[in-house]
C-alpha cells in the first residue's frame, strides 16, 4: 500500500503543526489523486491534534508505537513538514536509517547536510510538497534510490566510532593533551 508516515510527540507544538498541515492541507490533494493511499500519524498524545477526532479518509492515528521496525516496514515514505522549532532532527535521521525516502521542509532539514534530490526532498510550498508526496508514492524506484542514499549518508555521517575520534581530536587540539 502507498503509505505515508509522520512520527512525533504531539505534546510538542511544531509536531502538532506538522501533523495538522499533513492532514488538512496535503492529504486532501493526495487522496484526490490516490484514493488508496494511507497516512499514519503515529506518536504520543495524538489527542492534542485538532484533527484527531475527525474521520479523515485514509488517515490513522495509532498513538504510541512500540515496534518501529514493523511501522517502518509498512511505510513507503516519511513526511516531516516542520515549520518551526530547533534541535536535532532525529525523525529524519531515524527514517534515513530505515532507508525510507524523506519529504521535508527547509526548516525540517536544518542542521542535516543532506541534499535535496540526493538523500531527501525539500519543499516549502504546499502544492509542491503535495506533488512531491504523490511522485514518491507513485515511483517505487525513486523511493528506493532516495532511501538508500539517505541510509548510506546516515551510516557514514553519524558513525559512532568516527564521531568519537572526531571529538577526541577536538579535545586534543583544544587542551593539548593526548586522549
Regions found by a protein language model. Give the residues of each.
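Acidic donor-binding loop of glycosyltransferase active sites
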Residues: 73-87, 98-101
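Short hydrophobic beta-strand element within catalytic cores of glycosyltransferases
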Residues: 91-95, 101-105
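Glycosyltransferase donor-binding loop in the core domain
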Residues: 11-14, 87, 121, 155
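Conserved catalytic-core segment of nucleotide-activated headgroup transferases in glycan assembly
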Residues: 1-74
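A short, well-ordered alpha-helix in the C-terminal region of glycosyltransferases
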Residues: 142-156, 163-169
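Short acidic/histidine- and often glycine-rich active-site loop of Leloir-type glycosyltransferases
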Residues: 106-117, 121-122
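Short Ser/Thr-rich beta->loop micro-motif in glycosyltransferases that lines
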Residues: 63-64, 80-86, 107-108
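Conserved acidic donor-binding segment of nucleotide-sugar-dependent glycosyltransferases
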Residues: 120-127, 135-140
Amino acid at each position: 500500500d502507498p503509505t505515508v508516515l509522520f512520527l512525533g510527540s504531539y505534546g510538542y507544538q511544531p509536531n502538532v503543526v506538522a501533523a495538522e498541515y499533513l492532514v488538512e492541507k496535503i492529504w486532501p490533494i493526495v487522496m484526490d489523486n490516490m484514493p488508496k493511499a494511507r497516512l499514519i500519524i503515529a506518536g504520543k498524545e495524538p489527542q492534542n491534534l485538532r484533527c484527531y477526532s475527525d474521520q479523515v479518509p485514509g488517515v490513522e492515528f495509532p498513538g504510541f508505537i512500540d515496534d518501529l521496525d514493523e511501522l517502518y516496514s509498512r511505510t513507503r515514505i516519511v513526511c516531516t513538514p516542520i515549520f518551526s522549532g530547533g534541535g536535532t532532527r532525529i525523525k529524519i535521521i531515524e527514517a534515513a536509517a530505515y532507508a525510507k525516502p524523506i519529504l521535508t521542509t527547509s526548516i525540517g532539514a536544518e542542521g542535516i547536510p543532506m541534499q535535496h534530490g540526493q538523500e531527501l526532498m525539500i519543499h516549502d510550498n504546499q502544492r509542491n510538497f503535495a506533488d512531491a508526496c504523490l511522485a514518491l508514492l507513485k515511483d517505487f524506484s525513486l523511493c528506493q534510490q532516495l532511501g538508500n542514499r539517505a541510509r548510506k549518508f546516515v551510516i557514514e555521517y553519524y558513525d559512532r566510532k568516527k564521531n568519537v575520534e572526531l571529538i577526541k581530536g577536538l579535545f586534543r587540539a583544544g587542551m593539548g593533551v593526548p586522549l
